[in-house]
């Protein structure tokens, strides 16, 4: 599989680097002078050996899982990667000198069945390579050879040569029927990927400030990425890098001492922390004595004075409760690890960078350039007053995550405005040997801003930032109005109505974000997101409830699917049955694409495609047949099984996207 090949290349490079370091250590032991300290070399070599062990283990597991035997695809097989394996073997057999040529497999988007379902597009490239060796061979002839050397695969019904040298692949209905039957027996299985230890840094609100619409995208995107990676069996660490440290806490502590002098004995009744923050900021800006006291409280906080620590904890706890309320409403799970966690590690990283000679004094501060060219914007590691900065905190954090947490992959879900900052951090981490590109992956998952319907930054009518709690409340109100306009309040029980209301409200807010390319700004509109047509959560959720109702309305028991599958095969004779089955089988390819590129709108587009193709199927293929009196006279068990497979796939996708489907809406 292509991912496996990339990891094998990394492994070879890593082994060479480890061997090189071992040789340098041996040289140092023999007494020869080196520019790098022996102890540092040994530490670095130990880290590389650990990475090497983990990578070898993952590759061994993946190689065993892949097996190389295309005659026995697994439930977890991705169709594209399986076809890559088939044609990789064909290229190695027909053209051994080009066995390392990357295989090009593309889905066929034509509505005409004569072009097949997938296409191998390697013949033209191989023809060019042969020509460079003095061998003239037409791409169509090469395609014919590739076809002849393809090993038998139960996924492939037939292969045909088309055009100038394309190999069209037609999928097997028997395989599709078996794959969907297994899906119903065993649940939706994840595709096989090389397992990694991944840390996702997302949400990250600031203490003493309410979560607003600006936090919405990081929170929603981060949660869905975690769910996706967890489903793919990665070891995922969810981190909320709270803004819980800094000079602003000096004024908050000083204000707390004045407003609630007995705070050490009685928990202060701060009902509105935002107002409390504004009051302290006003005093800080207008009262010089208060400002001096605020600065002294910053110092006492940094020194760990018990009273200041207690005040800081009280303020943080008020914010935590507010954040947790939002997280529970949106079904977000994240572990708090704020800036305060890295205070001691900042001292350590500064000493580390100094020891490597990477810090320079510039106008009293200590800076670090991201690379040896000394261009761009340097990081400020130590301020002229001896204090630390966000740059220091982020360098300490990435070092902790790679060296102590032993992460293979770090994902920062932060807005596009921080792009330059994170690029600089990543380069600096690589320059200082904290980050090794051979064994680590770091990504800045950036996103655009949320706009109002006027195309400007989303604000309240008074020009204030929209509070996230107010936004969720408005969503609940709008979704209830829509349900009532459909008369659902008269059909559903109170609990069913509440479940449907929450499903629509929070689902629409999440989906309207995730269905857009995250890099783009997007317009927030309740009217558009609550439409029941087009690529909206409402359309998807309503389609899902309709699918669930089919088996329920059949008058038969479809709860024990494994037992039913013993007597019933999924038949795919009708063109709409076959189209739906092939659409469902794209799931693994889509999930792999989402995880590689970290874009979730691909999964949203897939869900929309499943729902539209299902609607075509349902309109053309009767699942339940009734007479003129409305009595059921026939139930097509195969088609209801296909409906249940569709529901299972949508359910898994909805979970990743954070949608909560209900069986009645």
Curated annotation (Swiss-Prot):
**Domain of life, per lineage:** Eukaryota
| EC number in record | 6.1.1.19
> Where does the motif 'HIGH' region lie?
205-216
Among the record's GO biological process terms, what is one?
arginyl-tRNA aminoacylation
Keyword Cytoplasm, does the record have it?
A: yes
What residues bind L-arginine, as annotated? 204-206, 215, 390, 394, 418
Tell me where it resides: Cytoplasm; Cytoplasm, Cytosol
Give positions of region: Interaction with tRNA: 535-549
A Pfam cross-reference name: DALR_1
Q: Which UniProt keywords apply?
A: Aminoacyl-tRNA synthetase, ATP-binding, Cytoplasm, Ligase, Nucleotide-binding, Protein biosynthesis
Q: Catalyzes what?
A: tRNA(Arg) + L-arginine + ATP = L-arginyl-tRNA(Arg) + AMP + diphosphate
Picking any one GO molecular function of the record gives: arginine-tRNA ligase activity
The record's SUPFAM superfamilies line, in alphabetical order, gives: Anticodon-binding domain of a subclass of class I aminoacyl-tRNA synthetases (SSF47323), Arginyl-tRNA synthetase (ArgRS), N-terminal 'additional' domain (SSF55190), Nucleotidylyl transferase (SSF52374)
Gene Ontology CC annotation, any one: cytoplasm
The answer to whether the entry has keyword Aminoacyl-tRNA synthetase is yes
Q: Which family does it belong to?
A: Belongs to the class-I aminoacyl-tRNA synthetase family.
Instruction: State its role.
Output: Forms part of a macromolecular complex that catalyzes the attachment of specific amino acids to cognate tRNAs during protein synthesis.
Q: Tell me the protein's name.
A: Probable arginine--tRNA ligase, cytoplasmic
Native source organism of the sequence: Drosophila melanogaster
This protein's encoding gene: ArgRS
């Amino acid at each position: 599989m292509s991912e496996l090949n990339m990891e094998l290349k990394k492994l070879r490079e890593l082994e060479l680097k480890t061997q090189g370091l071992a040789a340098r250590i041996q040289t140092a032991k023999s007494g020869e002078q080196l520019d790098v300290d022996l102890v540092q070399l040994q530490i670095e070599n130990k880290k590389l050996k650990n990475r090497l062990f983990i990578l070898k283990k993952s590759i061994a597991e993946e190689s065993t899982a892949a097996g190389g035997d295309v005659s026995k695809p697994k439930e977890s097989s991705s169709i594209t990667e399986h076809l890559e394996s088939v044609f990789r073997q064909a290229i190695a057999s027909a053209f051994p000198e080009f066995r390392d040529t990357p295989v090009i497999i593309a889905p066929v988007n034509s509505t005409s069945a004569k072009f097949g379902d997938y296409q191998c597009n390697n013949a033209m490239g191989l023809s060019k390579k042969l020509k460079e060796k003095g061998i003239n061979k037409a791409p169509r002839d090469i395609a014919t050879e590739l076809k002849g050397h393809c090993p038998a695969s139960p996924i492939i019904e037939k292969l045909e040569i088309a055009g100038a040298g394309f190999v069209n692949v037609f999928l097997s209905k028997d395989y599709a029927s078996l794959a969907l039957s297994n899906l119903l027996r065993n649940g939706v299985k994840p595709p096989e990927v090389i397992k990694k230890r991944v840390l996702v840094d997302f949400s990250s609100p600031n203490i003493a400030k309410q979560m607003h619409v600006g936090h919405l995208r990081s929170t929603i995107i981060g949660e869905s990425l975690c769910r996706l990676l967890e489903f793919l069996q990665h070891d995922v660490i969810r981190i909320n890098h709270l803004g819980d440290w800094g000079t602003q806490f000096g004024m908050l502590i000083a204000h707390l001492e004045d407003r609630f002098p007995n705070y050490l004995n009685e928990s202060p009744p701060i009902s509105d922390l935002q107002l409390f923050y504004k009051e302290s900021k006003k005093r800080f800006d207008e009262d010089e004595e208060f400002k001096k006291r605020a600065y002294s409280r910053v110092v006492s906080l940094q020194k760990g004075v018990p009273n200041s620590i207690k005040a800081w904890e009280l303020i943080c706890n008020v914010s935590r409760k507010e954040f947790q309320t939002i997280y529970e409403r949106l079904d977000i799970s994240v572990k708090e690890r704020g800036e305060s966690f890295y205070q001691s590690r900042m001292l350590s990283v500064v000493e580390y960078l100094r020891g490597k000679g990477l810090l320079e004094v510039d106008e009293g501060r200590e800076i670090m350039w991201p690379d040896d060219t000394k261009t761009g914007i340097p990081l400020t590691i130590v301020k002229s007053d001896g204090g630390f900065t966000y740059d220091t905190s982020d360098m300490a954090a990435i070092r902790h995550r790679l060296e102590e947490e032993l992460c293979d992959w770090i994902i920062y879900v932060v807005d596009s405005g921080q792009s330059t900052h994170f690029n600089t951090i990543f380069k600096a981490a690589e320059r200082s040997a904290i980050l090794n590109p051979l064994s680590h992956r770091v990504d800045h998952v950036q996103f655009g801003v949320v706009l109002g319907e006027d195309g400007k930054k989303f604000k309240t009518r008074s020009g204030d930032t929209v509070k996230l709690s107010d936004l969720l409340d408005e969503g609940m109100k709008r979704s209830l109005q829509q349900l009532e306009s459909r008369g659902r309040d008269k059909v559903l029980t109170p609990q069913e109505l509440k479940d449907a209301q929450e499903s629509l409200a929070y689902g629409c807010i999440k989906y309207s974000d995730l269905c857009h390319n995250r890099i783009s700004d997007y317009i927030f509109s309740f009217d558009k997101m609550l439409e029941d047509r087009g690529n909206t959560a409402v359309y998807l959720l309503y389609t899902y409830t309709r699918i669930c109702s089919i088996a329920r309305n059949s008058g038969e028991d479809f709860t024990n699917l494994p037992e039913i599958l013993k007597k019933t095969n999924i038949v795919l004779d009708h063109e709409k049955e076959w189209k739906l089955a092939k659409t469902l089988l794209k799931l693994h390819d889509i999930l792999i694409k989402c995880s590689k590129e970290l874009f979730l709108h691909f999964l949203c587009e897939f869900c929309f495609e499943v729902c539209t193709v299902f609607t075509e199927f349902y309109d053309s293929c009767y699942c339940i047949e009734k007479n003129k009196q409305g009595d059921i006279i026939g139930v097509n068990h195969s088609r209801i099984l296909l409906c249940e497979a569709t529901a299972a796939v949508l359910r898994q996708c909805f979970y990743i996207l954070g949608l909560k489907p209900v069986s009645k809406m």
